[in-house]
């Protein structure tokens, strides 16, 4: 495990470290050696006629595919509630990443890690 998981220094690191025992979550932190991993990637762009300003928590680009991972601390009862609540945001991020990288949207996976439910939710 990474050093920060074994010895978390911040509240955010403690929250994520507590989720790392879940295999599906841990897998998202083990990209291929060829992958480019960006953390807390700030984006500002116009999507259609809407200004989008946000931070992609984790963006993994590997060849002609990508994965956007967004951590959510919402206290939702179900994964479906979180998916519905955040789907539009992640889809907007995917469109922006697609424009920047030229990776088609259908090759960009959208994942939510719920720190409350300790699960991965595919959007």
Protein language model annotation of sequence segments:
Residues 49-123:
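Mg2+/Mn2+-dependent nuclease catalytic core
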């Amino acid at each position: 495990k990474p050093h920060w998981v074994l010895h978390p220094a911040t509240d955010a690191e403690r929250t994520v470290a507590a989720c790392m025992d879940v295999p599906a979550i841990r897998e998202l932190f083990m990209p291929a050696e060829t992958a480019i991993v960006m953390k807390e990637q700030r984006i500002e762009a116009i999507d259609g006629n809407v200004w989008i300003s946000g931070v992609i928590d984790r963006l993994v680009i590997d060849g002609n595919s990508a994965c956007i991972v967004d951590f959510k601390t919402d206290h939702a009862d179900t994964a479906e509630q979180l998916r519905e609540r955040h789907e539009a945001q992640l889809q907007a991020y995917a469109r922006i990443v697609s424009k920047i990288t030229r990776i088609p949207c259908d090759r960009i996976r959208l994942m939510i890690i719920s720190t409350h439910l300790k699960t991965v939710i595919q959007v």
